[in-house]
């Protein structure tokens, strides 16, 4: 079975959990900024903990265990409205680079590594406002890691310099684990460190 989709506040942090119901995935809110996901047997899922609303510039510390088998991302992940944008600052990933299908916008040096910038468009896809067409912004770390601090402002500034609109109204901003027809385990703790 799969944990039903939900979102809201838990122990001082905002969480979001979504799956397409196609696999077996369990999402658990642990104390404070910690969550746990076990997944397998197909399907698409994404969940994690963080804040609502997000900020263009927040210092996000994350640490924990991330053990994917197949296509998966560990990212600072969120949405804006006006414009509707889904964004990923990818810190670690499984078998395939998530930005491979996006328009290459060059690289930026942030948080002690080089990140590859990209943009892609999703057509008639699930969003925070139902089925919509919207842009995705990507910043993908080359030196993968499962703990560290992300200065989101570095990435939003880089997207802006590449011509992307970063003036939207923030919805949630979480450190999310995503799986796509894969399996794995993650237990991640997040904190706002300025």
Swiss-Prot record:
The UniProt entry, under Pfam families, shows: Glyco_hydro_11
Record keyword Nucleotide-binding present: no
Which parts of the sequence belong to the GH11 domain?
Answer: 1-191
- Pathway involvement of the protein, from the record: Glycan degradation; xylan degradation
Q: What class of enzyme is it?
A: hydrolase
The alphabetical list of record keywords is: Acetylation, Carbohydrate metabolism, Disulfide bond, Glycosidase, Hydrolase, Polysaccharide degradation, Xylan degradation
Catalytic activity entry: Endohydrolysis of (1->4)-beta-D-xylosidic linkages in xylans
Spell out the temperature dependence recorded for this entry.
Thermostable.
Residues annotated as catalytic: 86 (nucleophile), 178 (proton donor)
MF GO annotations: endo-1,4-beta-xylanase activity
The residue range of the signal peptide is none
Could you tell me which cysteines form disulfide bridges? 110-154
Q: What is its EC number?
A: 3.2.1.8
Q: List residues, modification N-acetylglycine.
A: 1
Biological process per Gene Ontology, one example term: xylan catabolic process
Task: Report the sequence similarity comment from the record.
Answer: Belongs to the glycosyl hydrolase 11 (cellulase G) family.
* Protein name in UniProt: Endo-1,4-beta-xylanase
């Amino acid at each position: 079975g799969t944990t039903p989709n939900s979102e809201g506040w838990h122990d001082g942090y905002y969480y979001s959990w979504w799956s397409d119901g196609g696999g077996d995935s369990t999402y658990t809110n642990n104390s404070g900024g910690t969550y746990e996901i076990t997944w397998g047997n197909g399907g698409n899922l994404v969940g994690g903990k963080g804040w609502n609303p997000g900020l263009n510039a927040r210092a996000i510390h994350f640490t924990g265990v991330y053990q994917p088998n197949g296509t998966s991302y560990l990212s600072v992940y969120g949405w804006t409205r006006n414009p509707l944008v889904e964004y990923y600052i990818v810190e670690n990933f499984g078998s395939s680079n998530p930005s491979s299908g996006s328009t290459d916008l060059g690289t930026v040096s942030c948080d002690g590594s080089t990140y590859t910038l990209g943009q892609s468009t999703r057509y008639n896809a699930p969003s925070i406002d139902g089925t919509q067409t919207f842009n995705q912004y990507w910043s993908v770390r080359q030196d993968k890691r499962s703990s560290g601090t992300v200065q989101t402002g570095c990435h939003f500034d880089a997207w802006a310099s590449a011509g992307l609109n970063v003036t939207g109204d923030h919805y949630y901003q979480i450190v999310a684990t995503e799986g796509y027809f894969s399996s794995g385990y993650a237990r991640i703790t997040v904190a706002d460190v300025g």
